[in-house]
Amino acid sequence: MAVASDFYLRYYVGHKGKFGHEFLEFEFRPDGKLRYANNSNYKNDVMIRKEAYVHKSVMEELKRIIDDSEITKEDDALWPPPDRVGRQELEIVIGDEHISFTTSKIGSLIDVNQSKDPEGLRVFYYLVQDLKCLVFSLIGLHFKIKPI
């Protein structure tokens, strides 16, 4: 596994629509800082921004999740490009590897299975689900808020 200074992760999902630019974004920086932003203008909701530092054990678990997913072996060339429905971005620096993925929003596994690269997109889909679950848990526990 890479040392903490060789690790960075950023995820973004969003779209511009009826309620403006709505998005969810989070990042883990090498020093353990977790930055979280959730912007929904639905019913004049306000943007939620939170920052917290996580323990090195959380960073190690994050790296383990990424390693286990084998996302670094994937390529987004055949994935659906961002469209009017929205876009997703995932950027990871782990050790000497720097990978970045961009695709459209994925509604369900049906979208994954109908893509040109269902195996690769499935890896991305499940990794994103795991990352969102971890981040929502960390934010919810730390700040006692409902992140969705």
Curated annotation (Swiss-Prot):
<comment type="similarity">
    <text>Belongs to the mago nashi family.</text>
</comment>
<dbReference type="GO" id="GO:0050684">
    <property type="term" value="P:regulation of mRNA processing"/>
</dbReference>
<dbReference type="GO" id="GO:0006406">
    <property type="term" value="P:mRNA export from nucleus"/>
</dbReference>
<keyword id="KW-0813">Transport</keyword>
<dbReference type="GO" id="GO:0008380">
    <property type="term" value="P:RNA splicing"/>
</dbReference>
<dbReference type="GO" id="GO:0003723">
    <property type="term" value="F:RNA binding"/>
</dbReference>
<keyword id="KW-0694">RNA-binding</keyword>
<keyword id="KW-0007">Acetylation</keyword>
<dbReference type="GO" id="GO:0043025">
    <property type="term" value="C:neuronal cell body"/>
</dbReference>
<comment type="function">
    <text>Required for pre-mRNA splicing as component of the spliceosome. Plays a redundant role with MAGOH in the exon junction complex and in the nonsense-mediated decay (NMD) pathway.</text>
</comment>
<dbReference type="GO" id="GO:0000398">
    <property type="term" value="P:mRNA splicing, via spliceosome"/>
</dbReference>
<keyword id="KW-0507">mRNA processing</keyword>
<keyword id="KW-0508">mRNA splicing</keyword>
<dbReference type="GO" id="GO:0005654">
    <property type="term" value="C:nucleoplasm"/>
</dbReference>
<protein>
    <recommendedName>
        <fullName>Protein mago nashi homolog 2</fullName>
    </recommendedName>
</protein>
<dbReference type="GO" id="GO:0071006">
    <property type="term" value="C:U2-type catalytic step 1 spliceosome"/>
</dbReference>
<dbReference type="Pfam" id="PF02792">
    <property type="entry name" value="Mago_nashi"/>
</dbReference>
<dbReference type="GO" id="GO:0071005">
    <property type="term" value="C:U2-type precatalytic spliceosome"/>
</dbReference>
<dbReference type="InterPro" id="IPR036605">
    <property type="entry name" value="Mago_nashi_sf"/>
</dbReference>
<dbReference type="GO" id="GO:0000184">
    <property type="term" value="P:nuclear-transcribed mRNA catabolic process, nonsense-mediated decay"/>
</dbReference>
<dbReference type="GO" id="GO:0035145">
    <property type="term" value="C:exon-exon junction complex"/>
</dbReference>
<keyword id="KW-0539">Nucleus</keyword>
<dbReference type="GO" id="GO:1990501">
    <property type="term" value="C:exon-exon junction subcomplex mago-y14"/>
</dbReference>
<dbReference type="GO" id="GO:0071013">
    <property type="term" value="C:catalytic step 2 spliceosome"/>
</dbReference>
<dbReference type="GO" id="GO:2000622">
    <property type="term" value="P:regulation of nuclear-transcribed mRNA catabolic process, nonsense-mediated decay"/>
</dbReference>
<keyword id="KW-0509">mRNA transport</keyword>
<comment type="subunit">
    <text>Component of the pre-catalytic, catalytic and post-catalytic spliceosome complexes. Heterodimer with RBM8A. Core component of the mRNA splicing-dependent exon junction complex (EJC); the core complex contains CASC3, EIF4A3, MAGOH or MAGOHB, and RBM8A.</text>
</comment>
<dbReference type="GO" id="GO:0005829">
    <property type="term" value="C:cytosol"/>
</dbReference>
<dbReference type="InterPro" id="IPR004023">
    <property type="entry name" value="Mago_nashi"/>
</dbReference>
<dbReference type="GO" id="GO:0005634">
    <property type="term" value="C:nucleus"/>
</dbReference>
<feature type="modified residue" description="N-acetylalanine">
    <location>
        <position position="2"/>
    </location>
</feature>
<keyword id="KW-0747">Spliceosome</keyword>
